[in-house]
């Protein structure tokens, strides 16, 4: 999420007192750099990342500065070499491509526009890579993930510099519950989304935040400064993350997590 998306978040919320205490643990989280991904000259940053279990590829969504060009790269998860790419000029449908998630049940990626229309989630058929008709939600959506264990979707929406709303949707995109949590952060910037068995992970500019299925913040772990973790996903029991750092796009692994995630 960059400044253009932050500027687009215009809703003002009354923040209630949290019903449950935050149970966070501050500890550094090690990230191991695996590779730099070379980008085409028409794009300059990544915003979405996920794992396609059908193709066995990482999928990286990259954009240009004004959200008019998008490239989706497929990456071999072993060699970390680009094996395919798909180019778009779809500001109205794809826009910022803020987060990317894969639903293996219907073989579709989902991304959020976040700049032209902050209420839409756009599907992309994962074999043809055709962009489909957007899904309009009643709530704003910026960080979006599919929970395959529960066949649900999770959306993390910034409220203030510290507070976030976590919205949960069924497989037909009907909202089923909402939690408001304190990410203990001092910036509205919010990145990434991962969901598994009711648990949710997202990042701020400096931390990973883990929330359980009852809306309790179980862990907040810092990561190395000077990088921006944009999105993350699991493959074979290990988490991987796409990072913007010093004008480069890099893939990192997280060999251990300080909390249990069913992935």
Language model features by range: what are they?
Residues 8-30, 57-89:
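Beta-propeller domains
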Residues 30-41, 81-91, 129-136, 174-185, ...:
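A short beta-strand motif characteristic of beta-propeller blades
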Residues 37-68, 96-98:
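Beta-strand-rich domains and repeat architectures in extracellular enzymes and scaffolds
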Residues 42-50, 92-101, 136-149, 184-195, ...:
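Repeated scaffold domains used in trafficking and secretory/extracellular systems
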Residues 54-56, 105-107, 149-151, 197-199, ...:
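Short coil/turn segments that connect the beta-strands within blades of beta-propeller domains
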Residues 67-74, 117-123, 161-169, 205-212, ...:
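Structural motif
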Residues 80-108, 113:
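Blade-loop segments of beta-propeller domains
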Residues 182-211:
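Loop/turn-rich, solvent-exposed surfaces of beta-rich toroidal or solenoidal domains
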